[in-house]
Curated annotation (Swiss-Prot):
One Pfam family here: TIMP
The encoding gene: Timp1
Species the sequence originates in: Mus musculus (Mouse)
Sequence segments annotated as region (Involved in metalloproteinase-binding): 25-28, 91-92
Designated name of the protein: Metalloproteinase inhibitor 1
Family the UniProt entry places it in: Belongs to the protease inhibitor I35 (TIMP) family.
């Protein structure tokens, strides 16, 4: 009795993939602090294998082994052990496709919490932990939280650009050739005085 429904689900999946094939997922990479502040959960974890696909919901889930939670203690409550990361099946719908086969490699994962489950996408800030600078690793563990809800990293997308508020910090990595993500790797936008935020060196904290 389940075969017709499975075939129908597969047909729907194929149809949606054809419709969405011309609409590639597109998102600008955020500053790490923005990714931290805008996420419900930030964890360090290892991916434990290939995803399990649910053809009915068009979502797949990756089994993960969390090694440390950096943000989200209050959000998850008693469910402090996150075992799965959910994402759309199709990359055209911003589904995340994990490429690494190394199950011992630790990743920084930022995501949203929906119905008690961790959801990630191709737009999530999700990188191998080892690729972060030591300053960024410290910031994800401690520093970035001080700017959440108070300060805003304001991206400069074209020159000239200007700040819209004293609580904004102008992020210029994307327009300065040769910057090598210098601001992203070494600075955080943090409060200096009430109503004023400035770039602060992560190495100085």
């Amino acid at each position: 009795m389940m075969a017709p429904f499975a075939s129908l689900a597969s047909g729907i999946l194929l149809l949606l993939s054809l419709i969405a094939s011309s609409k590639a997922c597109s998102c600008a990479p955020p500053h790490p602090q923005t990714a931290f502040c805008n996420s419900d959960l930030v964890i360090r974890a290892k991916f434990m294998g290939s995803p399990e696909i649910n053809e009915t919901t068009l979502y797949q889930r990756y089994k993960i082994k969390m090694t440390k939670m950096l943000k989200g203690f209050k959000a998850v409550g008693n469910a402090a052990d996150i075992r799965y990361a959910y994402t759309p099946v199709m990359e055209s719908l911003c589904g995340y496709a994990h490429k690494s086969q190394n199950r011992s490699e630790e990743f920084l994962i930022t995501g949203r919490l929906r119905n008690g489950n961790l959801h990630i996408s191709a737009c999530s800030f999700l990188v191998p932990w080892r690729t972060l600078s030591p300053a960024q690793q410290r910031a994800f563990s401690k520093t970035y939280s001080a700017g959440c809800g108070v300060c805003t990293v304001f991206p400069c997308l074209s020159i000239p650009c200007k700040l819209e508020s004293d609580t904004h910090c102008l992020w210029t990595d994307q327009v300065l050739v040769g910057s090598e993500d210098y601001q992203s790797r070494h600075f955080a936008c943090l409060p200096r005085n009430p109503g004023l935020c400035t770039w602060r060196s992560l190495g100085a904290r």
